[in-house]
């Protein structure tokens, strides 16, 4: 057995991989073993599995097909490996990634240490503010499903040059998919959803990065989302024509020519962000794209549906989780006005929930009086009927169930949290 594979299978590396998989949680694979059961499974089976891997006898199980609806229609096909295979894949990634980092492009930002969507957006803003305001937005058609496996393994060999490890990686590519209709072979692609897939996608697309660098082009790439910034429309047309041809000819990947297009910053959507020119600062800045904002609002609307069961406290806990996650991702962008609007609408919807849960006029009168409303006004308001939105926008209800009251109940203010996180991005 090779030294590299021994390093992958070492106790320290596999323990770290096990902890990472447990921390990420996630659903089980085709064997129905869950993350919670993983420790017992490893204690019972790991010695045998390790020996099988050493002798090239281990056979990974097929991934479980899960289809996630896309916002614009269609589905994203994910392949969920078994939890044991996730641990092994994570062990491979932990050892091979440091070997890949020195050869990866400076302008590649996906699934790499100390890099993120935010760093990709920051770099794109630098290009825009240097005058590179024509954008070639490349769309690779079903990238993870269409990666040529032989070409990919050739690139892996160039980096690690280790037959035992390459054999194990190829087995994961060939493991197949289990769908409701039965087993399907995988002769193309690397299943999106496995721990290995992000690293393998970067290895494949590093060839594109090198070609773009050799041409002196300014680009940012996050996984298979790649944009190229140039100074003129003529340059953009030339780059789009030659690069799409190169991708199909040299990498054997499919380019979706209906979605690959030339655009300007104002119309660009990249990694969920939109872009605008700040007239005062006279520079390009970013903010959440309108589609991203709409999706966020819809999610909050779902969580504040008055027909959904659960206490106000439970609802607020779920709302806070969504607010923090969304704002942490988009905190680099400018969005004070949007945050203030969402705050106001969110508080109104929570007032409706509270009003409905009080149910009867006597309970509503009691609730308003407890929050400081005078007896007569509380009684008058409480007997207004069940026109929820109309009642909860009345001044006395707004003042009673105020921002401060909802904050004491635990609700995070979108605007306050955004201001806090955005300030950190400017440091």
Regions found by a protein language model. Give the residues of each.
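Non-catalytic, polymerase-adjacent accessory regions of viral genome-replication enzymes
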Residues: 1-41
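Conserved polymerase palm-domain catalytic core
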Residues: 52-67, 71, 103-269
